[in-house]
Amino acid sequence: MHNIFKGLITAAITPFKDNTLDLDALEKILEHQIKYEVDGVLIAGSTGECSNLSFEEYKLLLQTSLEIVNKRIPIISGCSSNNTAYARELAAESTKIGVDGFMASPPSYIKPTQEGIYKHFEALHEACNIPIMLYSAPTRSGVDFSDETILRLSKLSRILALKDCGVDLERPMRIRTIVKEDFNLLTGNDEVVLAFNAQGGVGWVSVASNIVPNICKELLEKWYKNDVKEALEIHQRLLPLYKALFVESNPIPIKYAAHYLGLCANKIRLPLTEASYKTKKQIENIITSLSIKI
């Protein structure tokens, strides 16, 4: 099975208009990603406010994304839930709709054991026939995969990658030494992209690339060509943006940044709230200093 989980994957925001999906803005967002040749787009992940979508909205979001993209880049769906039966339903529906792969985290809130985490993903694996990426986000889910559980799950034929949002930079090297060579490791933490890839990673699931896919793509290309000096210079230039995008809960800052640049309305669903005045000004100043334009 072809491993689509590599390179630059944008964790896309979900645009709203009033209290509905803004499908015109979705097209603008996706075309911006395609223009700069990102390697994939994640739809309905954490950045896409997955927990604030109804099942019907989830399906419409995926269907419309696939129609817009029209096979130009891979579309990856988010299938995280603390209810295994519902997560299976998301995975099965994603497969039916035709996405290229999906990503899921361990069940949040209920804190399953490692055996429970394994069984959860085994159930998702059985519900589909498309590539799966594990999603390690312990600050969100309250639990994480042990190295041993990652190894066990990597032996299931369609589980091909791990997105790691942590800051343990020994972990990718540890995992790299125990899993098969074609199991890919990607960081989900913009701030550690170079350090993570130096330790065995092969890609990046980025929040910042919603608005700077061109710069993020250039950074990775410099890195892959061993132009470390230029990659570091780009990374250092983007660090203030990375940090600003997490001064409030993601996706609050990136939604405002996208709005400020004209990609979508600054609509976000409760319990998330709009960015504070201070955050808005910080975002605006960084966008100006980096000369970001859409």
From Swiss-Prot:
It catalyses: L-aspartate 4-semialdehyde + pyruvate = (2S,4S)-4-hydroxy-2,3,4,5-tetrahydrodipicolinate + H2O + H(+). Its EC number is 4.3.3.7. The record marks S46, Y109 as: Part of a proton relay during catalysis. One of its GO terms (molecular function) is (R,S)-4-hydroxy-2-oxoglutarate aldolase activity. Pathway: Amino-acid biosynthesis; L-lysine biosynthesis via DAP pathway; (S)-tetrahydrodipicolinate from L-aspartate: step 3/4. The active site is at Y135 (proton donor/acceptor), K163 (schiff-base intermediate with substrate). It comes from the Bacteria. Pfam families: DHDPS (PF00701). GO terms for cellular component: cytoplasm. GO terms for biological process: diaminopimelate biosynthetic process; glyoxylate catabolic process; lysine biosynthetic process via diaminopimelate. Pyruvate binds at T47, V205. It is found in: Cytoplasm. Keywords: Amino-acid biosynthesis, Cytoplasm, Diaminopimelate biosynthesis, Lyase, Lysine biosynthesis, Schiff base. InterPro entries: Aldolase_TIM, DapA, DapA-like, Schiff_base-form_aldolases_AS. Catalyzes the condensation of (S)-aspartate-beta-semialdehyde [(S)-ASA] and pyruvate to 4-hydroxy-tetrahydrodipicolinate (HTPA). Belongs to the DapA family. Homotetramer; dimer of dimers. HAMAP family: DapA (MF_00418). This is 4-hydroxy-tetrahydrodipicolinate synthase. It comes from Rickettsia canadensis (strain McKiel).
